[in-house]
A protein has these predicted regions:
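Membrane-interface aromatic/basic loop that binds lipid-linked glycans or pyrophosphate carriers
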Residues: 247-302
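Glycine-rich, basic loop-to-helix element that forms the pyrophosphate-binding segment
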Residues: 43-59, 66-72
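A conserved acidic beta->alpha catalytic loop
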Residues: 2, 17-26, 44
């Protein structure tokens, strides 16, 4: 509904019914009957990545966008980005998001700041946690980034954005970024992710962080300073994984992953001052003081 509410109408909507067992297939068919610019693809369940890849292969437009079905966008999203879209100048158009607990949560406006980056520089901004996130649903992509470079979302994996966005940035020529928050990301329970951890989720996240950090495709394009920034991003990700293992009390059950993450942290140890701008800097301090697990044990007690 939030896509249909857009003032800028030069788009098509592809609904991918990924083997839904509820009333979703019929709802999709009803939309197709009511709107001539909506089409539906019914397929067997293959997960989010396969659904996105299917959408890309059927899309007719110059750009593709992947909003999640339980989130929504501001009604002026496309019209606000129309100039950037219609110029056909940018390979990726990136905006910002607001984490909300319900539709009553309003987005807080900020003075608009826009930036234009070369693809590699946009990737570095993502590594710095500035201007650009690692998520896919707050970005509009030129379709040819996928088709011309044989890039797909990894099928059967969690955290598929983590394993895809860095490739897209590094083949992109020009990226438009705005700080404006057009995307509402719904969080029913802030702790729901940590409550639903399993071994595959830890493995997939750990695997993508390692892949990005050690990839020749990445390393060959970065200078020494940028490689160090990549290392800090990697360490920040490793600390997030280790902290999540401790918080969910799964570190002993998944001892192999816990040990591997610790080994990578030891191999890529950085100073506390170097981590000062990282989101998980406090957790890294606790890790270096050897009290990270204790901190979460105390938190769970109280």
């Amino acid at each position: 509904e939030s896509v249909l509410a857009q003032e800028w109408k030069d788009y098509e909507i592809l609904l991918v019914d990924d083997g839904s067992t509820d009333h979703s297939p019929q709802i999709c068919d009803d939309y197709v009957k009511d709107y001539d610019f909506i089409s539906v693809i019914h397929k067997e369940n293959g997960g989010l990545s396969e659904a996105r890849n299917t959408g890309i292969s059927h899309a007719k437009g110059e750009y593709v966008y992947f909003p999640d079905s339980d989130d929504w966008i501001e009604p002026d999203t496309f019209i606000a980005l129309a100039e950037a879209l219609e110029s056909l100048e940018f390979d990726i158009i990136s905006f910002n998001r607001e984490f909300v607990k319900g539709e009553e949560d309003a987005i807080v406006s900020e003075p608009e700041v826009t930036q234009v980056f070369e693809g590699k520089d946009a990737f570095v901004q993502m590594l710095k946690h500035r201007y650009i996130t690692g998520f896919a649903n707050d970005k509009i992509y030129r379709k040819s980034l996928f088709t011309d470079h044989n890039i797909q979302f990894p099928i059967g994996k969690y955290y598929e954005d983590l394993g895809t966005n860095y490739k897209l940035f590094l083949v992109a020529k020009k990226v438009y970024a705005t700080n404006q928050k057009y995307y509402h990301y719904l969080i029913d329970n802030p702790d729901s992710i940590t409550q639903s951890w399993n071994e595959k989720k830890f493995r997939d996240m750990f695997g993508f962080y390692k892949e990005m950090f050690y990839s020749d495709f990445v390393c060959s394009q970065l200078n020494q300073e940028e490689l160090h920034i990549s290392q800090l991003y990697y360490v920040n990700g490793l600390i997030h994984i280790l902290a999540s293992l401790y918080k969910s009390k799964l570190d002993k059950e998944y001892i192999d992953i816990t040990d591997e993450v610790k080994q990578e942290l030891l191999k890529n140890s950085v100073s506390l001052s170097q981590m000062k701008d990282q989101p998980n800097k406090l957790k890294y301090v606790l890790y270096r003081l050897k009290v990270l697990k204790l901190a979460f044990s105390i938190q769970n007690v109280f």
